[in-house]
Amino acid sequence: MGDVNRIKSVAQRVKETYAAGNQVIVVVSARSGVTNELIGRAKSLNPDPDDREMDLLLTVGEQETIALTAMALHAIGVPAVSRTGKEAGILTDLAHTRARITSISGGDIKDQLDAGKVVILAGFQGYSPDGQITTLGRGGSDLSAIAISAALNADICQIYTDVDGVYTADPRVVEHASKLSEIAYEEMLELASSGSKVMQNRAVEFAQKFDVVFEVRSSFNNNPGTIVKEEAASMEDVVVSGVALDKNQAKVVVSDLPDHPGTAAELFNALADAGISVDMIVQNIGREGKANMTFTVPRDAINRAEKTVVELFPDEAQGKLFEASDIAKVSVVGVGMRTHTGVAAKLFAALAQAGVNIQLVSTSEIKIAVGIDPKDAEQATRIVHDAFDLGVESS
């Protein structure tokens, strides 16, 4: 959502859908910039604000939007009612600021729809078993929309964004990136997890689990978007579907760890317990019974990662235990990689020819990701995009 004019525009589009005889649930996020403004205010008072209080604060943005959207619909003759995440029965675990949905009752949403009303639902939020407000993390409104669609068995789920679909790369980085008409859940999940900002990765994961077919489309026009669905046999004809760039990563080197069985498990269990997502892991055997571990984490998790590592290995913390530096991750994704060979060779050759040094590599069945110097990130994305001939209209 943007300003008041954007809310009016959304209301008009909802009216058209409602007038066509559909029951409509509209899941909304905070107005553009509001969440960042609230975070800024909080951190001006306390650089490390309490997670529970942050959840209470940040849900203000969505609650403002649901009320304004309902008012805008009333003004053009559409019966509408707003509902918070708690009123919709979106139950989560206790993890404030990054809660996971455990169940959805739907509250009275079905009754309101049957009564002929449009329901405006606050995205991004739910409530914990002890009744406290929780939030679902950045992009959580996508997850709310997918989850309520699954719970109520909706016929169609449309995700409206500031882009008109899923592209072979970020069009702001690769000018000739092309829009995909469809993409498999797995590919979308890998792209979302690799830096693509179109959708929250947990939302895609939820859609795949409950087989919610959805369309990513633009808020600003009526053009068809990208359908995200279960993999079709024809999708394997395309080896690579897209290239993702994530510049919000840090490379962490943990040095002089005890080189014995269980150390790695101990380290990564502790990081997981701290809610830190880890990727691209490399272990180097050191000397004299010591080993070094290198991995990547989101840049905003560096302080938490360091605190976790130092607390876990206090004896080693007297030396050069923890070092962090910026890194960029470029990933190629495609379900066709399962049945085609040579993808890694082509990727590495393209980067080598351009003089881009690879620091780290990670792979899955349908993804290859490389960690590189951030200064090379955008150039590398364009090079890889061209190497796999993605600059043509994809189907």
Which residues fall in each region the model found?
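Acidic, glycine-rich loop-and-beta core segments that form the ion-binding/anion-interacting portion
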Residues: 173-178, 183-193, 198, 202-250, ...
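Nucleotide/pyrophosphate-binding catalytic subdomain
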Residues: 1-204, 284, 296, 372-373, ...
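A broad, structural surface signal
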Residues: 12, 36, 71, 193, ...
